[in-house]
């Protein structure tokens, strides 16, 4: 009878300790970082006529949109056309990046209708040791002019 009580005590102690130990191992926060460059081009490729690289798109508003129009986060490109976003939303389902600033802003000869848009690609996943943090790195696949987005 005494051994049954001791067994029950150890069983209860193990059941109580398991969630606490499991909480240390299971990530509690996912931080998503998205970064990239925006070029002043309808497709981000070389200038077909001159063979030159497209210029960057400074001071452009870049939005992370999930669903049709739900803006999750936004930022402004720097003078080099670079941007960076950090969000604690995960998973990012049906999300893409949209440059809300018209393309004609960086080059008056380009279209003012439509917006540059890009889907996302996974760059890396980093696990924080002992912190429970997972950092997901994403980047644009490439911005292309989409005439159906405003």
UniProtKB/Swiss-Prot annotation:
The keyword DNA damage does not apply. Inhibits spore germination and leaf infection by fungal pathogens. InterPro entries: Phylloplanin-like (IPR040404). Residues 1-23 form the signal peptide. Probably covalently linked to cuticular lipids and/or trichome exudate diterpens or sugar esters in order to increase the solubility in exudate and the dispersion on the leaf surface. It is found in: Secreted. It comes from the Eukaryota. This is Phylloplanin. Expressed in small glandular secreting trichomes (SGTs). The keyword Secreted applies. One of its GO terms (cellular component) is extracellular region. GO terms for biological process: defense response. Keywords: Plant defense, Secreted, Signal.
